[in-house]
Amino acid sequence: MIKRIASIGILVLIIVIGFIQKDELLHIIKEGGTLSIFISMLLVAICVFFPIIPFTVLAGIIGAVFGITHGAIISLTGAMVGTMAFFFLSRYGFRDFAREKLLKYPKVREYESFFNRNSFVAIITSRLIPVIPAPVVNTICGLSKVRWLTFFSASAIGKIPNILLLSYVGSSFSSNKLYSVGLYGIYIVIVFLINFVIVYRRMSKTSS
């Protein structure tokens, strides 16, 4: 009970601070400098729990301020800090509460079995092609038998392409807005079509 209360308290505090101070934090990021690096990582980590700022916008801003390479490293670091915090909170903080809620959905058991059988490949795939929402992936993996190192490495690898693209789009936005928006738009369409095909195939198998 104490673990649950402490975990929920920490989570709520992080979200509240981020939500109240988001404008000030964004201003610091845009100024650049050492402090803005840590603030950028903090905001990205908070967005893993609660999207106070759309991640596409935040990663794009970070890319615009720090450039493609440094921006991608900063965004990836923040994303992994938040992702691992989510994972460990699910596993050790509010495990019973999370399991009780998720088990109300029969599909979750299928996902959990899938992650347990093919954890590394399954996690990478779920990051590259987000058929399953990221918070659900984090929670299921935290509740499952997936090792934290496997979860960390697979999640990091799976997040790299999207973060690199967002950093590139952000860095080139000021010089060519149409190109940047169009490039990410094409990426979104491709991901959507892949998701559509996967869902359609699953529905076809279920109905047959």
Predicted features along the sequence, with ranges:
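Transmembrane alpha-helical core residues of multi-pass small-molecule transporters
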Residues: 78-82, 157-158, 170, 186-190
